[in-house]
Amino acid sequence: MKAALIGAGEESLHTIQKAQELGVYVTALDGNPDAEGLKAADEGLTIDISDEKAVLDALQDRKPDFLITGPIGRYLTTAGAVNDALGLAGISRQAAEYCTDKYLFHKKLQEKNLRNCRCLLIPAEAAPAQAGDLARDFSTLQYPAILKPRYGSGSRGIFFLNNPRELEQALTCIFPENQDTAAPTEDYVLEEAAPGVEYGVDACMDKDRFRMILLRKKLITHPCQTGHRLPERKPREDETQRLLWERAAAYLTETTALLGLKTASSTQTS
């Protein structure tokens, strides 16, 4: 068996090791020539994983039986493109785009009433001088709210906002006052924070069937952008926990079907 690993950072080492223990020949790709996974794999290729064509060209003749990925964030779309082109099981490019584009994800779920908080797009092309105007445009927004990059993971660049004043301050960080003509290098989204307790979900797609593995409660520390993960707690086996599990599983089953996810593992926070 042959596998291609897209994204070969340090976090991929365990995956490579386990694949090799099963007798799988691993070809790893990463744009960083010093990536740890390139050295650990049976074959390492220095290729920018954001370049779908270059990745496809490299794998076309190698004909991997399946893909394995590290935490590659936005460029999960490259894995989807490879799966589509080579007819491999796993996430499609369209499904990967839904999962990595936070604004598109919101719009897609909103179509089926699976998400009811307001979510607004702040494009990178917006002029810095508009920061104050943008804050006024969002005057009907309900707080708390979250401002975050349209793409990315790991709580990167997140602002947790409790009032309009904090929103204006956050927009000033995105639009530096001393750069009259500069614009943010990326789009942002501003959305109303869902009330209640935050939960993390670990799950996988068994073909087109959603299977939940772990449901864990999460707490937000201050400040939010420094991270908010805490050690997992073993859930109590009582009626409340059982009903919560069933409700989360039912919602995510509908969500994954809408996004077209098949044969994949995922972690989703709600």
Feature map (PLM): residue ranges:
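Phosphate-binding core of ATP-grasp and ATP-grasp-like enzymes
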Residues: 174-178, 184, 192-237, 245-270
